[in-house]
Amino acid sequence: MAKTPESLESSINEITDRALDRDCTTLSRHVLQQLQSFSPDAQDLSALMNRIALAGKLVARRMSRAGLMEGVLGFTGEVNVQGESVKKMDVYANDVFISVFKQSGLVCRLASEEMENPYYIPENCPIGRYTLLYDPIDGSSNTDNNLSLGSIFAIRQQEGTDSDGKATDLLANGRKQLAAGYILYGPCTMLVYTIGKGVHSFVLDPSLGEFILTEENIRIPNHGSVYSVNEGNFWQWEESIREYIRYVHRTEGYSARYSGAMVSDIHRILVQGGVFLYPGTIQNPEGKLRLLYETAPLAFLIEQAGGRATTGLVNILDVVPKKLHQRTPLIIGSKEDVAKVESFIQNGH
């Protein structure tokens, strides 16, 4: 039965109202809505997410001009604490996060994969109760090729005074994270986050200079066709991982997708389902990815979306690091697909 003009107008108004409500939902407003509170703790978390968003805007602006500016692309000639060659964009993004959080008054320490030790902000430490852990640029090898990149972040509450400057309270499992997420720098700049109340995505509207809500309570499919892994490392892996790769090669319905930027690959899997693997190798069974800056934040987010993250033997969020820059293997994504990889690791099939 055809709708009456009145009911049609009502439907249009309802759609318009929903669109306007979405357009008005900024990141800071959304955090407060999620916490259903204007308590000091809720306002702190909202302010911290605003700072992360500002860092993302600054990095995105720099990237959008990278091909037009001197001194942005290429390597610095230095090596970081991980033994990796440092890109100029790594240094810039790391400095951006430090500068942005110096002004927050809430963060006493920042810990990054680019710095051997945490960066302390003395003027914030008397009142700053939080620590930001982050990977300023994920996939920096993509920078010079104009491909997608990302930033990964987590917020933890400081425990104790850390008077000796060793930050031992950070050596705790991933369930201590208050918030985590990533910023994806692609055709648009997207921020995806969780504070333990689901996973939500925002897109940077350049005309407003604001991250605007695009999707709430994202759920990862239980199974997907995509597997994402650098198959160039095939002969460096344990036989169990090689057997899994042989399995997906001979089984109909699987598609390989690997961009070289973990944030980009995991975002695809969050939306479409599937599994991302960065296993250890025979020579380095602990893997390459850093627990505190990369795997734990992403594990928190994916679990909140209904997925799983594991080393192959242990849930990532249950791993207790022994040192700040501890590495770990990572299998992350849809529940069924992660379970299949685990089965190969634990049972050989």
Curated annotation (Swiss-Prot):
EC annotation from Swiss-Prot or TrEMBL: 3.1.3.11
Localization per record: Cytoplasm
Stored PROSITE patterns: FBPASE
SUPFAM superfamilies assigned to the protein according to its UniProt record, in alphabetical order: Carbohydrate phosphatase
Keyword Metal-binding: yes
Binding site for substrate: 138-141, 230, 258, 288
Details of cofactor binding: Binds 2 magnesium ions per subunit.
Example of a GO biological process term: gluconeogenesis
Principal subcellular localization: cytoplasm
One GO cellular component, as annotated: cytosol
Pathway as given in its UniProt record: Carbohydrate biosynthesis; Calvin cycle
Residues that bind Mg(2+) 1: 113, 135, 137
GO molecular function, one term: fructose 1,6-bisphosphate 1-phosphatase activity
PANTHER family with a match to the protein in the record: FRUCTOSE-1,6-BISPHOSPHATASE-RELATED (PTHR11556), SEDOHEPTULOSE-1,7-BISPHOSPHATASE, CHLOROPLASTIC (PTHR11556:SF35)
Name of the protein: Fructose-1,6-bisphosphatase class 1
